[in-house]
Swiss-Prot record:
Keywords: Amino-acid biosynthesis, Cytoplasm, Hydrolase, Magnesium, Metal-binding, Methionine biosynthesis, Nucleus. This is Enolase-phosphatase E1. GO terms for cellular component: cytoplasm; nucleus. It comes from the Eukaryota. Its cofactor is Mg(2+). Its EC number is 3.1.3.77. It is an enzyme of class 3 (hydrolase). Bifunctional enzyme that catalyzes the enolization of 2,3-diketo-5-methylthiopentyl-1-phosphate (DK-MTP-1-P) into the intermediate 2-hydroxy-3-keto-5-methylthiopentenyl-1-phosphate (HK-MTPenyl-1-P), which is then dephosphorylated to form the acireductone 1,2-dihydroxy-3-keto-5-methylthiopentene (DHK-MTPene). Pfam families: Hydrolase. SUPFAM superfamilies: HAD-like. HAMAP family: Salvage_MtnC, Salvage_MtnC_euk. It is found in: Cytoplasm; Nucleus.
Amino acid sequence: MLGNEIKVILLDIEGTTTSIGFVHHILFPYAKQNVEEYLKKEWDSDEIKQIVQDLQQVPSFEVYKATLVDSSASSITVELITGFVRYLIDKDLKVTPLKTLQGLIWANGYESGELKGHVYDDVKEAFEHWNNSGLKLAIYSSGSVAAQKLIFGYSTSGNLLPYLSAHFDTHVGHKQEKDSYINIAKSLETNPEHILFLTDIPGEADAARAAGLQAIILQRFGNAPLTDDEKSLNKIINDFSVLKVDK
């Protein structure tokens, strides 16, 4: 049950609302597979020109070029940038121009119907219940706000964006830092003790509690196992069904 003191529920995405494997097993491979076609189609657009320029400033770009057979080639081609983007994805290097490009490719996939944002079966019902009970819902994820909105706007349970009041990404700070949650509480104009944070990562729950928020750990199927210490220090639930508002 949720006490009357809770005014806002702040949710993580991966491992909380969405399968831990969705981003790595569906979204990343989709971007990797479709990057060349997308670049060919949009190569002359101002947006892609800027991304290509920014990618060339990434330190790994020269490292990547040195691995090529013709490493002295100076022309910037679709093939060169495609190869570098795939290299970054394989190395799991999270650089801003890559994130921006991935977001554009994913948007294309969602809009065409090729992609659906995975959410667990209990998510829509919980969102409805919490909203109907007067609670605000907000998302905090390391994925960009744009990527968050695609997952929930084109989800397997339909468009869930109307249930969500706010979205936060690493622009407010990293997820295992106390100040990030202080910044979120200020942005939401809500006292920290009135915010419940739901996540699958104990370090994030610790940071949220250090900022004065309440926190609960989701132990969904497929999530990383918790240590005995983590189990003893945290309230743990398997899904959202137990989080009913105490009328």
